Amino acid sequence: MEKLMFHPHGKEFHHNPFSVLGRFREEEPIHRFELKRFGATYPAWLITRYDDCMAFLKDNRITRDVKNVMNQEQIKMLNVSEDIDFVSDHMLAKDTPDHTRLRSLVHQAFTPRTIENLRGSIEQIAEQLLDEMEKENKADIMKSFASPLPFIVISELMGIPKEDRSQFQIWTNAMVDTSEGNRELTNQALREFKDYIAKLIHDRRIKPKDDLISKLVHAEENGSKLSEKELYSMLFLLVVAGLETTVNLLGSGTLALLQHKKECEKLKQQPEMIATAVEELLRYTSPVVMMANRWAIEDFTYKGHSIKRGDMIFIGIGSANRDPNFFENPEILNINRSPNRHISFGFGIHFCLGAPLARLEGHIAFKALLKRFPDIELAVAPDDIQWRKNVFLRGLESLPVSLSK
């Protein structure tokens, strides 16, 4: 039998990560591999079964903070140059107590009331986008709806002026590109993003507005505030993790519904099922297909596998969400599925702070789309669908549809 070897940048994984991860889940659920990145090689582990993923997400022997296991020279090789190292200094890259402090400060600007107050605005944005789509019989869901909706929402939430949003979109697209060949373009986008955010932070310190940046700048607890670098990191995290995962949910979720006509019809007839439908789309599509940036802080043995200090840990979210030992008929989309304990938003102290916003956008977007265009159909062969090049985030390049029969 051919020895399994995980290639995160390989064509097979890019085309269908669920199939690749599923094979590891069945044959080698705890898989050691060598990660080649930016000219260096790192020992790593791929975890693919639900119970094992949960165990590693809970394990205190696993750190999110690379500084706990690597020196500055190693970090520089793995990551990016010092002027943009804020990308690895956000709260998802911290353990307690640093994580607790950061999350507490950020939560002040991201309360449930803040999110719920966005409902009317999100509904209005969705309807305006659908109005534009209605002018034609065909559309690209990604270009016309799935990408602009969360982008406009996050831009308004942050207080990004309308005249700056096209450039902001360019930076965002570049920052989520994980292909090694585009490293310098990504780094340049990060530098420009940082310079732009620095100006906004400066303005909000002097003259606060009713936006997220102002709230983050002025958030305080026990005399502690977010530093300049922490502000860059948090806003980077918000844009990359918050924006792209929602774009992926809306795009891949629409594709999943169009490919499962019975479930799509069920949702059209019973829009009150939207909450369970969105949870199932989160499970089935896994907008974050894999979580990385975790390291063992000490040597330990797990189920007979010898894990060494400094080993990288990859959590196969997309595989855990389709584990037949945990989900009944996991390869089938079932919008009635309940309970649905997917881990698309992570687990524990690093559970996604933006989950309520992503869910709200999903509820509004799918209901509005299916109500406006009940006859929407896929306008391209499934094999011709193009996926974005990102090892960790699963998203579509485009999704051509016909809007009426």
From Swiss-Prot:
<dbReference type="GO" id="GO:0016705">
    <property type="term" value="F:oxidoreductase activity, acting on paired donors, with incorporation or reduction of molecular oxygen"/>
</dbReference>
<keyword id="KW-0408">Iron</keyword>
<keyword id="KW-1003">Cell membrane</keyword>
<dbReference type="GO" id="GO:0020037">
    <property type="term" value="F:heme binding"/>
</dbReference>
<comment type="pathway">
    <text>Antibiotic biosynthesis; bacillaene biosynthesis.</text>
</comment>
<dbReference type="GO" id="GO:0017000">
    <property type="term" value="P:antibiotic biosynthetic process"/>
</dbReference>
<comment type="function">
    <text>Involved in the metabolism of the antibiotic polyketide bacillaene which is involved in secondary metabolism. The substrate is dihydrobacillaene.</text>
</comment>
<feature type="binding site" description="axial binding residue">
    <location>
        <position position="352"/>
    </location>
    <ligand>
        <name>heme</name>
    </ligand>
</feature>
<keyword id="KW-0479">Metal-binding</keyword>
<feature type="transmembrane region" description="Helical">
    <location>
        <begin position="231"/>
        <end position="251"/>
    </location>
</feature>
<keyword id="KW-0560">Oxidoreductase</keyword>
<dbReference type="InterPro" id="IPR017972">
    <property type="entry name" value="Cyt_P450_CS"/>
</dbReference>
<keyword id="KW-1133">Transmembrane helix</keyword>
<dbReference type="GO" id="GO:0005886">
    <property type="term" value="C:plasma membrane"/>
</dbReference>
<dbReference type="GO" id="GO:0005506">
    <property type="term" value="F:iron ion binding"/>
</dbReference>
<keyword id="KW-0472">Membrane</keyword>
<dbReference type="Pfam" id="PF00067">
    <property type="entry name" value="p450"/>
</dbReference>
<keyword id="KW-0812">Transmembrane</keyword>
<keyword id="KW-0503">Monooxygenase</keyword>
<keyword id="KW-0045">Antibiotic biosynthesis</keyword>
<dbReference type="GO" id="GO:0004497">
    <property type="term" value="F:monooxygenase activity"/>
</dbReference>
<dbReference type="InterPro" id="IPR001128">
    <property type="entry name" value="Cyt_P450"/>
</dbReference>
<dbReference type="InterPro" id="IPR036396">
    <property type="entry name" value="Cyt_P450_sf"/>
</dbReference>
<comment type="similarity">
    <text>Belongs to the cytochrome P450 family.</text>
</comment>
<protein>
    <recommendedName>
        <fullName>Polyketide biosynthesis cytochrome P450 PksS</fullName>
        <ecNumber>1.14.-.-</ecNumber>
    </recommendedName>
</protein>
<keyword id="KW-0349">Heme</keyword>
<dbReference type="InterPro" id="IPR002397">
    <property type="entry name" value="Cyt_P450_B"/>
</dbReference>
